[in-house]
Amino acid sequence: KPADLTEEDYSKFYRELYPYGEEPLFHIHLNVDYPFNLTGILYFPKVKNNIELQRNKIQLYCNQVFVTDSVEGIVPEFLTLLHGVIDSPDIPLNVSRSYLQSDGNVKKISSHITKKVADRLQEIFKAERQDFENKWDSLKIFINYGMLTDEKFYERAVKFNLFKNTDGKYFTAEEYKTLVESNQTDKDGNLIYLYTNDAEQQFSYIEAAKAKGYDVLVMDGQLDVHLASMLEQKNEKSRYVRVDSDTIDNIILKDNAATVELTANEQNALSSIFKAELPEDKDNNFWVSFAALDAESMPVMITQQEFMRRMKEMAATQGGMMSFYGQMPNSYNLVVNTNHALIKRLMNNAQQSVGEKVAPIDSEIAELRNIVDSINAANKDKKDDEIAETDKELIKNNNDKIAQLEKDKEALYKDFAKGEDMVRQLVDLALLANNMLKGEALSNFVKRSTQFI
C-alpha cells in the first residue's frame, strides 16, 4: 500500500528495475480494486528529445507472471514513455497482442492509467508549482506527446501544460493568454503568439518584438511545431508565429501600420539590385520585399514564411503526405527597410549611376503599356474570338518588347550592384544574422568589412 512505503522505497525499487537509469522525476502508485484489480508503480523518467529510445520500459504482469514489456496499443501511446510495473489479474495471459488491444478490461485499465497520470500531474502542479516548473524541461515532451495523441489527456493537461517565455517565466495557457491578449491581438482579431526556437540565433528578432512591448515564447522542443498547429485548430482566431517569419509589424498587423512610400519603379530597381547579390542554389529560394520600418531598425533582414517552414519541419518527423513539403526548397524573404539611411543612400547611388540610362527605358515601357491598355479597353466587352487578330498580335509584340526592356533595365541594375560593395555587404549582414553566411562567402565578408573599417 502507498501508505506503507517511503520515498526511499520507491527509489530503491526503481534502481532494481533500471540499475543504470537516472533517478526519475517522480512516481505514481496505482492501487485499484474496482471496477477491476490493478496495482503498479509508474515512474516519470527524465525524458530526452528522442521519443523512440524511451519506449518499452513498462513491464506488464498478471498475478506476478510477466506478460510483456512491449505495451504499445495496450496503454495509450504516450504512456509508453513512462517506466515501471503494472500488475493486474484482469489482464489475460498467453494471448496475442491484437487480443490484448481489443480486450475490454485492458481498455478500461488504459483509460484509468491515463486519468491517474493526469490527476497526479495536476496534483503536483497545484501543490508544488515551483518544483513542477523546475522539472518542466524533462516533463514537457511527455506531456506534449500525450496532448497530441490522446484527446482525454489533452482535456486534463491543458490546465497544467506550461509555456516558457524568453525571460524564463512559466505560464499556463490561460495565464499567458491574459498576459498578451490586449497587446498581441492584430487588427483582424487574431491573437498572435510569438515564439522562438533558438533564442540566441533569433536574438535580433526577439529584441524587435520586445521593443514593441510584445512577449516571446520559447518553443524549441521536438513536438512544439505539432502542438502549435493543434492549438491553432482548437482555439479559434489564435496563431503561433515564429519571430523571424516576417517583420514584427507584419506579424501583428495593426490599423496604424506604416506604408512603403517608394514608387513601383523604385521598388523594382531595389529588387533587381539586391537579387543580383542574393545566393543562388537549388535548395534555397530568395525574393525581395519592402517594409517601412523604424529608421533605427536593420536596413535589411531575412525572414522565412511561417506556413512553409512549419510544413517542412513537420515533414521531417511525420513523412507520408507531408514529405511533399520536405522536398521543396527553403523559401526566404529579404526585407528591405525603406526608411533606413543606407537604403536611401543606395537608391541615390543607383539613380546617379544608371538613372540616365534607365529613364528612356522606363519611358518606352510606359508608352508600350499605354498602347496595350488602350487596345484592351477597346476590346473589354468582346469575346476572345471577336477580337481582331491584328490587335492580338500588337498586344503580343508590345508585351514581348516590354519583357525585353525589363530585362535590359534589370541588367543595368545588376551591373551597378556588382560594382557597389554596399549591396554585397548588406546582403551578407542579413545572411550572417540568420547564420546563413559560411565558407568562402563568410571569409570574403570579413575581408570586405576590414576594408570598410
Residue ranges and their predicted role:
Residues 1-453:
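Conserved GHKL (Bergerat-fold) ATPase module
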